[in-house]
């Protein structure tokens, strides 16, 4: 009927969580700024005019989980019955997250000088899928928390002299390490903040 729950009710529900409740819970779990692991890798030499490139990044920080935080991406599904439970789903954009590191690279040219670098990595059009479920009038719980395939924009302050093959290898290793760092936080500590948050806001009726 006219009073049936719609995607707009779901949107309001999710917006209320991501705008206030989730940032507060994430902050209480110390997720304003998260230390992420250091890493190192080698990009192999491809010709006599370049050497193996030795790269290391440390002092990694992940920010953006609390402020500006995650935002709803598109419309949520309308609340609907699945068995005896009401369930709704939504995509949340991860593009406000930001990874930063300092580091160094040696071997981008035959001179083999050591270059100090700073690295900034931002997810682009990347999202998480959240599903919340609740028994009739009961406390909501997190049914699904899924991170979809991540794409990154990678920025390095000091340009390295790399041919296309080596540049691709350099960027793909950074993307791989960035994905591991993000998933490690999003699927454990941040998931706990999400679980706490959905429990505290009443779901819309179907």
Language model region names:
Residues 132-202:
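Extended amphipathic ligand-handling, pore-lining, and cofactor/metal-binding catalytic surfaces
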Residues 110-134:
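An exposed acidic His-Trp-rich patch
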Residues 77, 84-94, 126-142:
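Terminal amphipathic/targeting segments at protein termini used for secretion
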Residues 67-68, 76, 81, 117, ...:
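Glycine-rich loops and low-complexity Gly/Arg-rich segments
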Residues 89-99, 105, 113-115, 127-129, ...:
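Extracellular/luminal segments of secreted precursors and ectodomains of membrane proteins
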Residues 46, 60, 95-106, 124-126, ...:
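Hydrophobic lipid-interacting interfaces of membrane-associated proteins
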Residues 1-118, 205-206:
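Tubular lipid-binding modules of the TULIP superfamily
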